[in-house]
């Protein structure tokens, strides 16, 4: 028997949980999965327990979620793919790849703590990587008896959202308890239902770039014995039918190949659509021929480049950025889509240095080519932390 076909009967929306590492993102994700499985049983709504979402063995020993977990569920209105984005500062790299996959996100803030430095960092990062919409789950609300404290925390979170140009005044803020909901406490089960109603109503149905030429950044590469090499990622735009020719662009010389199979959530598809997480089986391609950071594209639609002009905002010290200025010939990493590439910065004439908190134009020469177009966003990173974010304004070479 072949794999089940993936049914596209409802709008598909990519969401996720972001926020401080100890505020209960993974517990909340498990609670959403359980509550929906109980309330709307279906083939999609299968309960995922905490351990399976928090998977990957070496991470749980230290109590830190590193990898991104994908959980699938549906409400009566929509089908959701939910990424549990890691919260620890060391793993902001994954946050960048995770947050980039969201049409909207649930910001998890513990009512017992309120917004912390990491919460701020995540909201800032969500803005930089283009998460269009945030709403708030005030988790652990069962542990706060004083209604006034809950109101103060809500106010603080709204101010934080507004400070990063999210709609802090109107974003839904729902009091939840992931733990109590998992235990089946009726009051808190209802709050999870209320949270998902808010997600249905407030995260706009994404406008997919289906008519543009196909592009999917490679996040992971693996071998399926007897079938060949599979690359996974989220299709950014376009559609791709089985047996289409594609090019693998960036980092190495461009290669042409054919897609012989497409999967999503372990189900076979005839085509991949913009906005979906999928796996592509590539004909005659070896595991070592492809790497994270490359893109799979419609032939001829995108070209690799090393030199570009860009404009970037350099984070202030308070936002977790550098403590001192940088000068011409500064060599940070430029994070494009799913990978870091070292680049050398040349500053505009008359600009001696760039201070934390400044916005600047720059010329950049990367040490490896990246599939690039004007308008493409990037993060500037050093030693694993984000120190700036910008956009390609002009391709030079």
Swiss-Prot record:
Residues 19-26 are annotated as: G1. It comes from Clavibacter michiganensis subsp. michiganensis (strain NCPPB 382). Residues 177-179 are annotated as: G5. GO terms for cellular component: cytosol. It is an enzyme of class 3 (hydrolase). SUPFAM superfamilies: EF-Tu/eEF-1alpha/eIF2-gamma C-terminal domain (SSF50465), P-loop containing nucleoside triphosphate hydrolases (SSF52540), Translation proteins (SSF50447). This is Elongation factor Tu. The keyword ATP-binding does not apply.
